[in-house]
Amino acid sequence: METPKTALLGRTLDEIQQIVRNLGMPKFAAKQITSWLYDKKVETIDEMTNLSLKHREALKEGYEVGASAPVEEMRSVDGTVKYLFRTPAHNFIEAVYIPDEDRATLCVSSQVGCKMNCKFCMTGKQGFTANLSAHQILNQIYSIPEREKLTNLVFMGMGEPFDNLDEVLKVLEILTSEYGYGWSPKRITVSSVGLKKGLERFLNESDCHLAISMHTPIPSQRRDLMPAEKAFSITEIIDILHNYDFSKQRRLSFEYIVFKGVNDSLIYAKEIVKLLRGIECRVNLIRFHAIPNVDLEGVDMETMVAFRDYLTQHGVFATIRASRGEDIFAACGMLSTAKQQKEKGVTLQ
């Protein structure tokens, strides 16, 4: 049986330099390889024509580019596209392409499933199977047909990015480095429930935007909706955020799904104003998308507008996020590959 080759895709410049040294290739070959990967986006090592034939053959013995196309796609009536990817371990993940008038955003996954078990999220109901490598995360960007149209990237797909932060930070380095994609960090937003072990490290090691899943300003209620609150509370998250400056390039936002009869009254808006006082941020209000076996409901637009207007009038910039891809289960909280995982015989935790 042939030994699987190691993917070059998802490797940082430092890692490529180590590979080059190990193979006895000239030092400058590392930047040639990263250029072929992240600028020209080749599919095979044979296409790296400024490497000598000898060095290409040496590289091919143990390595491959490692790009793999989606195995399935679903298209929404609103233009949103949901892509299904199979990982080398035969796990399944989803990514969502969201075109808009002057923007094109890709929502990527960082894990197969998720440990956080948020009450309102289908990925959380799926349970956790595996972390994704930098290769598997970057492949979602590398391998969609619309990759050259992308203006923005959000880590809001399957999984908790801070629970797989080593790999997420590698991807962010590749995307924002001169040797990689060369993107501005302002094009990228990472969303998290706010894990303590990852929050400060992310803020210190990355300049990308941060989105915190709040969903209620009341800790006792947040514990019911989001078990992660038990380990690290929303008030502790806010305490840490006060130590950072979000008034310049990096943007801080709070995600707030509005549930009927749960967190939709202006009492909650008032508490949000108190909680966020002194922090430069915005609140994104999100309509709840019903998922199976969850006894939560969304609210009407009138309620959303009243909530937004209260926040704005009291000094907290707020927006209502447009729902996209609901008809193909691609909207916020609706991603799940539980069906595919079950069909291949994976035991979900």
Curated annotation (Swiss-Prot):
Instruction: Please state where this protein is localized.
Output: Cytoplasm
> Which residues are noted in the entry as [4Fe-4S] cluster-binding?
114, 118, 121
The cofactor note reads: Binds 1 [4Fe-4S] cluster. The cluster is coordinated with 3 cysteines and an exchangeable S-adenosyl-L-methionine.
GO-annotated biological processes: rRNA base methylation; tRNA methylation
Query: Which terms in the Gene Ontology molecular function aspect does this entry carry?
Result: 4 iron, 4 sulfur cluster binding; metal ion binding; rRNA (adenine(2503)-C2-)-methyltransferase activity; rRNA binding; tRNA (adenine(37)-C2)-methyltransferase activity; tRNA binding
Q: Does the keyword Iron-sulfur apply?
A: yes
Q: Supply the enzyme class, top level.
A: transferase
- Cofactor(s) named in the record: [4Fe-4S] cluster
EC number(s) from the headed UniProt entry: 2.1.1.192
Where is S-adenosyl-L-methionine annotated to bind? 159-160, 191, 213-215, 289
Catalytic residues? 94, 332
Name any GO cellular component annotation.
cytoplasm
Q: What does this protein do?
A: Specifically methylates position 2 of adenine 2503 in 23S rRNA and position 2 of adenine 37 in tRNAs.
Q: Which NCBIfam families match?
A: rRNA_mod_RlmN
Q: Which HAMAP family match?
A: RNA_methyltr_RlmN
Instruction: Give the family per the record.
Output: Belongs to the radical SAM superfamily. RlmN family.
Q: Could you identify this protein by its name?
A: Probable dual-specificity RNA methyltransferase RlmN
